[in-house]
Regions:
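Claisen-condensing/thiolase-fold acyl-transfer catalytic domains that form or cleave C-C bonds
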Residues: 75-76, 96, 101-122, 211, ...
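A contiguous, well-structured pocket-lining segment that forms one wall/lid of small-molecule binding clefts
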Residues: 26-27, 38, 42, 56-58, ...
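Conserved beta-ketoacyl condensing-enzyme motif
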Residues: 4-93, 229-245
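Condensing-enzyme catalytic core mediating Claisen C-C bond formation in acyl metabolism
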Residues: 1-42, 128, 143-212, 216, ...
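Active-site glycine-rich loop that binds ribose-phosphate moieties when present
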Residues: 95-96, 102, 109-116, 133-159
Length: 313
């Protein structure tokens, strides 16, 4: 199963010096897996650390100390004071910074975070919105032997990303957003809180349902802003899995190389939930000028969300 996933590497915050997470000294050692409380304790420590690493990389490219707003997305843990407050405090940001925490939305939460940042900047042109996505999926390994949950767990790894959204003419400009929820699809992707962490249910029907949805010309017209999908310069598709990327490629009749950025992120990192789309956008940001791009992600609902993007200047 792992060989067919198109994933070469996945990463975890679980300490390497402890050996294999499922070994005798690992986090999952023993017959009984850790309870949810133990997993949340680790999340409270490790999630801010990983988020700060992402912000440090961003800081090498752009100033962040004058951020007026902070938007954080995460679905792999809970802590109060919230991870948004922890990040703001650890970064030394103003105590008056306005914060938004987008929780438990799953893989398309980066769309919601960036969309929220865009709305803030449109209403307050001087705003500088720091956006952070951080996910620790490897804290939620489940002691199961059924094929479907095993396949789901094979997809996910840990990751974090950060971006600054402002009216400054730099980078990519976020355009019109879109969202849709598929009918009778609420059981296809689930993220349930249990006594032993969060349990992922990812139905094998998801790729086919996505392909069926993308066969709707009216929906594709909205997603592609009225253009032929093949005329879009850059498709930033959430790297949710090999079969999901294949479904999007075939349904939209895209060239084989169109989703190379998404496939590269999948191969190097696996599915990092909300952080994944940010990694894909970072690769596109490094390209020469992109005139017409579309970001597209899927998650619980089953829902699809995204936005158009283009040059900021």
């Amino acid at each position: 199963m792992a060989a067919r996933s198109a994933i070469a590497h996945r990463w975890s915050v679980l300490p390497a010096e402890a050996g294999s997470p499922v070994g005798e000294t690992g986090f999952y050692a023993g017959l009984d897996h850790p309870g949810t409380a133990a997993r949340m304790t680790l999340y409270a420590d490790a999630a801010p650390e990983l988020a700060l690493c992402a912000v440090a990389s961003l800081r090498e490219q752009i100033r962040i100390d004058d951020a007026t707003h902070l938007v954080v997305a995460s679905c792999t843990g809970f802590v109060a004071p919230g991870i948004d407050q922890i990040i703001a405090r650890r970064l030394g940001l103003s105590p008056s910074i306005e914060r938004v925490l987008i929780g438990f939305m799953g893989c398309y939460a980066a769309v919601a975070a960036l969309r929220t940042a865009r709305h803030i900047v449109r209403s307050e042109p001087d705003a500088r919105v720091l956006v952070v996505t951080v996910e620790l999926s490897t804290l939620h390994l489940q002691a199961v032997d059924e094929i479907e949950p095993l396949l789901a767990m094979l997809q996910f790894g840990d990751g974090a990303a950060a971006a600054m959204v402002s009216a400054e003419p730099r980078g990519l400009a976020i355009g019109q957003s879109f969202a849709t929820t598929l009918a009778e699809s609420d059981k296809l992707i689930r993220w349930d809180i249990t006594d032993t962490g969060f349990a992922m249910h990812l139905s094998g029907e998801v790729p086919a349902r996505i392909a069926t949805a993308l066969a709707d010309r009216d929906l594709v017209k909205i997603i592609a802003a009225g253009q032929d999908p093949r005329a879009i310069d850059a498709w930033a598709v959430h790297a949710g899995g090999r079969s999901i990327l294949d479904a999007v490629e075939h349904a939209l009749m895209l060239d084989a190389a169109t989703l190379d950025d998404s496939r590269a992120v999948l191969a190097a990192n696996g599915n990092m939930s909300s952080a994944t789309l940010m990694f894909v956008l970072a690769r596109i940001l490094a390209r020469p000028r992109v005139e017409h791009g579309v970001a597209l992600a899927f998650g619980p609902g089953l829902a699809a969300e995204g936005f158009a993007f283009g040059p900021a200047a």
